[in-house]
Amino acid sequence: MSFRDALNLPSSEITDESVYRDRRRLLQLLALTPALGVAGCAEADPPPPPKTVVTPAQARSGFRTAEELTRLEDVTSYNNFYEFGTDKTDPSKAAKTLKLSPWTVKVGGECEKPGSLSLDELLKGIASEERIYRLRCVEGWSMVIPWTGVPLGEVLKRFAPTSKAKYVAFTTLADPQQMPGVRYRSINWPYREGLRIDEAMHPLTLLATGLYGKPLPQQNGAPLRLVVPWKYGFKSIKSIVEIRFVEKMPETAWHDLQPSEYGFFSNVNPAVDHPRWSQKTERRIAGTASKLFAERIATKPFNGYADQVASLYAGMDLKKWF
């Protein structure tokens, strides 16, 4: 079965309006300031991950939530996907230019079975699952989304990662012909993200191919994106074209851009504020005829998935390794 076939809200109304403007202003400033950027990556290595075992029951308990789903029209029209523009409504308008077939994902690095595969080859034989996850943006808003996809760990095992594979690095397509935002130096393209290997193998980590029972729309990261529900949304990289097993912590786009504001781990943590706004609360996207946001709610550690993932970070200083 092929994984491909395949809306307009008020723009730039995030958390407090100033938060949204601050994040855009940072991108504009850095685009004009070549001296800023890669500095800050030369940090001490984090402590090694503890030996943890996640039971099937623990994992399953995080696969669904009874919270009210965010409306499909909001999920598909209120997006961060800077390859298509920095306004929230830009991706739903501009991403229609993204060609989804053919789509190839290159897998390599510290593994015994590297290769370049079509999407169907990559996912062949792995049962698709529905997961209803909370999504928490670093900007202070959140959604509840029914995703369809496969466990990332099941895909990665096929490539037989070696003992040197301590991290997994991901890369988004960067094609200025299809992605107008790539023509501007708002980010050091291509967009890159990474996970520690145990995070990537965790049962909650999903390679998503759809939402609301349909293939992913282009603006939501089609045809293949990551969903890591206990981390801020920018870790859930979209439109993936490359996966690499690496020994050292990989460079990631937002950390590369501003390391003091966007850590590599970026676990949702209400006890660690962003330097320019609080992370203690969030505003759930709950669009109605009269308003886009519902009332503020308290943000939970690890976005409410602490029972499933907190053990991955036992002994780590989460304020240092934010």
Curated annotation (Swiss-Prot):
The keyword Metal-binding applies. Its EC number is 1.8.5.-. The keyword Repeat does not apply. One of its GO terms (cellular component) is periplasmic space. One of its GO terms (molecular function) is metal ion binding. Mo-molybdopterin binds at N79, Y82, E83, C137, T172, N220, R225, S236, I237, K238. Predicted to be exported by the Tat system. The position of the signal peptide cleavage has not been experimentally proven. Keywords: Metal-binding, Molybdenum, Oxidoreductase, Periplasm, Signal. Binds 1 Mo-molybdopterin (Mo-MPT) cofactor per subunit. Heterodimer of a catalytic subunit (MsrP) and a heme-binding subunit (MsrQ). Belongs to the MsrP family. Part of the MsrPQ system that repairs oxidized periplasmic proteins containing methionine sulfoxide residues (Met-O), using respiratory chain electrons. Thus protects these proteins from oxidative-stress damage caused by reactive species of oxygen and chlorine generated by the host defense mechanisms. MsrPQ is essential for the maintenance of envelope integrity under bleach stress, rescuing a wide series of structurally unrelated periplasmic proteins from methionine oxidation. This is Protein-methionine-sulfoxide reductase catalytic subunit MsrP. It comes from Xanthomonas axonopodis pv. citri (strain 306).
